[in-house]
C-alpha cells in the first residue's frame, strides 16, 4: 500500500498548473459592424423586412463591436441559399465547411502557441480540443493531431457543444491533467465558427437576431503545464483554483439545438440579469480562501458575452470603468467567439500589461479571475495568479 501511495505522489506535480503560451487566429474575412446590417439583409434576401432590419441595426450599434471575422464568404452564401434562409435545410452545407475549418483554424492558433512556448511539439502529452461546430467522428482533435503532426500517442479529449462558458472548462480540465500527470504539457485549443448558427432573419424569432449581431469566428490555443522549467519555459499565469456552477432559476435561458437547419440558438431577455445577479456567489467562494473581497483589487478576464452582461456585472460589483477593459477590447475587435473568446481576453490582458509597462501580467496586480458564462446557465470560475514582467 505504501508503494501505491509513493507511485501516486510521484505522478503529481509539486506546484500548480501554469499557462505557458497563448496563440490566437481568425479567418481572413472581415466584416465591419457598421456595414453588417446592409450586408446581412442583402445576402439573406430579406431587405423587404424593413422593420426587422431597423431592429437589427440598433442591435449592431449597441453591440460594442467594431468588426468581426467569419469563415463564410459571399461566394459560399450565394452557392448555398438554404444557409441564408431562416430555417432552410442546410446542415450538410454547414458541416462541409465546419469539419474542415474548425481544425484548420485551431491549427493556426496552436502553431502560434507552440512557437511562443519554444519547445518541440513532440513534448505535448495531452490535447484538449473544444468547439460547438463541426461535430464529426473522428473529431477535430484527431484532425488537429494529424495536421499539426503531434505524437500519435498524445492523449486526446474532444469537447463538443458546450458554448460560451467552455473557455473556462478547458482550463479547469487542463489544470487537473497537468497537476496529476507530472511533467505533462497540455495543448488546449478552442476553435469556434458561426457556420452552424448563421441564418436569415424571421419576425417570429427576434431573439435569433441577437446572435447574428454578436457571434463571430476565432480560435485560441494555450500550452498548460505544472512546474515549468525556468531555463526553457516561462509561466504567464498560474491556475490556482477552478470551479463550475449552475445558476438558480436559469433553465432554458440559453439553449442550442442541432437540427436539419443547423444549430438554432435561443436567448431569453433576462440572461444578463441572471448572470450579474448571481455572479457574487462563485466570486465569494473562489476568493474567500485568499481573504479577498475587494473586486477592484483583482484583474478581470470575463467572457464578453454581450454589452448588457458586461455593463450589469460592472454595476452589480461596483467595478471601476477600466476593470473590464480587456473584455471590451476583444468584444470590439472580434465579437463573441464563444469558448475561444475569454482566451483572447487573457491574451489581451498579458499583451496590454506588457505594453503599458505594468509590473505583472495582471495589469500590475497579483490575483485575478477568469469567468466563462454560457448555456445552463453555467459559470466557470478560474482564480489566476499573475507573474512579474521582466524589465
Swiss-Prot record:
Pfam families associated with the record: Chal_sti_synt_C (PF02797), Chal_sti_synt_N (PF00195)
Active-site residues (renumbered): 164
Key word Calcium present: no
Keyword set, alphabetical order: Acyltransferase, Flavonoid biosynthesis, Transferase
Keyword Transferase on entry: yes
EC number per UniProt: 2.3.1.159
Molecular function GO labels: acridone synthase activity
Catalyzed reactions per annotation: N-methylanthraniloyl-CoA + 3 malonyl-CoA + 3 H(+) = 1,3-dihydroxy-N-methylacridone + 3 CO2 + 4 CoA + H2O
Family stated for the protein in its record: Belongs to the thiolase-like superfamily. Chalcone/stilbene synthases family.
The name this protein goes by in its record: Probable acridone synthase 3
Amino acid at each position: 500500500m505504501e508503494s501505491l501511495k509513493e507511485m501516486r505522489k510521484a505522478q503529481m506535480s509539486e506546484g500548480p498548473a501554469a499557462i505557458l503560451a497563448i496563440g490566437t487566429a481568425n479567418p481572413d474575412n472581415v466584416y465591419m459592424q457598421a456595414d453588417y446590417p446592409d450586408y446581412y439583409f442583402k445576402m439573406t434576401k430579406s431587405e423587404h423586412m424593413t422593420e426587422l432590419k431597423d431592429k437589427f441595426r440598433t442591435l449592431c450599434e449597441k453591440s460594442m463591436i467594431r468588426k468581426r471575422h467569419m469563415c463564410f464568404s459571399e461566394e459560399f452564401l450565394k452557392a448555398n441559399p438554404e444557409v441564408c434562409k431562416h430555417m432552410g435545410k442546410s446542415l450538410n452545407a454547414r458541416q462541409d465547411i465546419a469539419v474542415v475549418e474548425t481544425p484548420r483554424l485551431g491549427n493556426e492558433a496552436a502553431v502560434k502557441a507552440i512557437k511562443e512556448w519554444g519547445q518541440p511539439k513532440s513534448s505535448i502529452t495531452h490535447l484538449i480540443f473544444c468547439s460547438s461546430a463541426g461535430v464529426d467522428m473522428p473529431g477535430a482533435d484527431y484532425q488537429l493531431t494529424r495536421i499539426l503532426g503531434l505524437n500519435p500517442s498524445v492523449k486526446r479529449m474532444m469537447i463538443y457543444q458546450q458554448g460560451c462558458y467552455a473557455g473556462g472548462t478547458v482550463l479547469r480540465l487542463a489544470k487537473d491533467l497537468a497537476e496529476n500527470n507530472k511533467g505533462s504539457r497540455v495543448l488546449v485549443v478552442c476553435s469556434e465558427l458561426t457556420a452552424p448558427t448563421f441564418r436569415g432573419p424571421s419576425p417570429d424569432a427576434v431573439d435569433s437576431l441577437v446572435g447574428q449581431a454578436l457571434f463571430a469566428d476565432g480560435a485560441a490555443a494555450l500550452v498548460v503545464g505544472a512546474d515549468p522549467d525556468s531555463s526553457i519555459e516561462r509561466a504567464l499565469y498560474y491556475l490556482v483554483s477552478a470551479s463550475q456552477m449552475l445558476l438558480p432559476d436559469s433553465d432554458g435561458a440559453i439553449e442550442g439545438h442541432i437540427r436539419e437547419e443547423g444549430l438554432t440558438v435561443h436567448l431569453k431577455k433576462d440572461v444578463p440579469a441572471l448572470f450579474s445577479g448571481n455572479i457574487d456567489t462563485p466570486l465569494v467562494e473562489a476568493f474567500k480562501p485568499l481573504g479577498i473581497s475587494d473586486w477592484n483589487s483583482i484583474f478581470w478576464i470575463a467572457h464578453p458575452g454581450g454589452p448588457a452582461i458586461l455593463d450589469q456585472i460592472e454595476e452589480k460589483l461596483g467595478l471601476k470603468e477600466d476593470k473590464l477593459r480587456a473584455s471590451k477590447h476583444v468584444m470590439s475587435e472580434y465579437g463573441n467567439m464563444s469558448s475561444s473568446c475569454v482566451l483572447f481576453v487573457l491574451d489581451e490582458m498579458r499583451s496590454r500589461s506588457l505594453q503599458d509597462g505594468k509590473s505583472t501580467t495582471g495589469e500590475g496586480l497579483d490575483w485575478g479571475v477568469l469567468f466563462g458564462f454560457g448555456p445552463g446557465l453555467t459559470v466557470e470560475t478560474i482564480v489566476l495568479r499573475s507573474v512579474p514582467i521582466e524589465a
